[in-house]
């Protein structure tokens, strides 16, 4: 089984991915695929450099490019693990690419949802170089993500984890999802 994690920036995808890893479930990061590609091409791993690489690979491989870059890692991990998590799926084209490449695998989309206010506060605390510093920048970034297609992926998710009530509740929601997976209920 492949779980495709999606969610708006600051929703908690990385936190959820780390919780899966703590339970021995391997995680492949779509963002890492872009960072690795930047390194191969000798492009700095700055926000501008990563955006440049993202655009170039999409020009070369099509709109599902980042998924294409992660397929070899996912395939290798599936040889040894019953479940693999892919963190950071952002477009319907990427979901379609995984479905095309892994026809014999069960694929589920898991969306992490948080309110805009909660996400903005998390991004301010996180302080990554590419995180918005103002509400206006945050709204613009959300608009770009939605134009990219992430809203459609979230809307069509098989399972939604709400991340509003603190870390303990988030962990409980993740535990519930993992139990459902291994009990064959998802």
From Swiss-Prot:
Matching entries from HAMAP family are given as: UPF0200
Which family does the UniProt entry place this protein in?
Belongs to the UPF0200 family.
DNA repair: present as a keyword of the record? no
Q: Name one GO molecular function term.
A: ATP binding
Q: Does the keyword Ribosomal protein apply?
A: no
Can you tell me which residues bind ATP? 7-14
Cited SUPFAM superfamilies: P-loop containing nucleoside triphosphate hydrolases
Among InterPro entries, the record links this protein to: NTP_hydrolase-rel, P-loop_NTPase
Entry-linked PANTHER family: DEPHOSPHO-COA KINASE, UPF0200 PROTEIN MJ1399
Q: Which residues form the signal peptide?
A: none
Transmembrane regions listed in the UniProt entry = none
Q: Which organism is it from?
A: Pyrococcus furiosus (strain ATCC 43587 / DSM 3638 / JCM 8422 / Vc1)
Task: Please report the name of this protein according to its UniProt entry.
Answer: UPF0200 protein PF1294
Pfam entry (one): AAA_17
Keywords on record: ATP-binding, Nucleotide-binding
């Amino acid at each position: 089984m492949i779980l495709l994690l999606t969610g708006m920036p600051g929703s908690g995808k990385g936190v959820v991915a780390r919780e899966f890893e703590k339970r021995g479930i391997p995680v492949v990061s779509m963002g890492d695929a872009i960072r690795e590609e930047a390194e191969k091409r000798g492009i700095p791993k700055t926000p501008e450099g990563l955006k440049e690489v993202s655009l170039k690979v999409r020009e070369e491989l099509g709109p599902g490019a980042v998924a294409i870059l992660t397929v070899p890692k996912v395939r290798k991990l599936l040889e040894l693990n019953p479940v693999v998590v892919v963190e950071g799926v952002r477009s319907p084209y990427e979901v379609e690419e995984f479905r095309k490449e892994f026809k014999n695998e069960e694929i589920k989309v898991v969306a992490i949802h948080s309110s805009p206010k909660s996400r903005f506060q998390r991004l301010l605390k996180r302080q990554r170089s590419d995180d918005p510093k103002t509400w206006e920048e945050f709204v613009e970034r959300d608009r770009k993500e939605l134009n990219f297609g992430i809203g459609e992926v979230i809307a069509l998710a098989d399972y939604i984890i709400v991340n509003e009530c603190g870390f303990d509740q988030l962990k409980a929601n993740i535990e519930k999802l993992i139990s459902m997976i291994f009990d064959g209920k998802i």
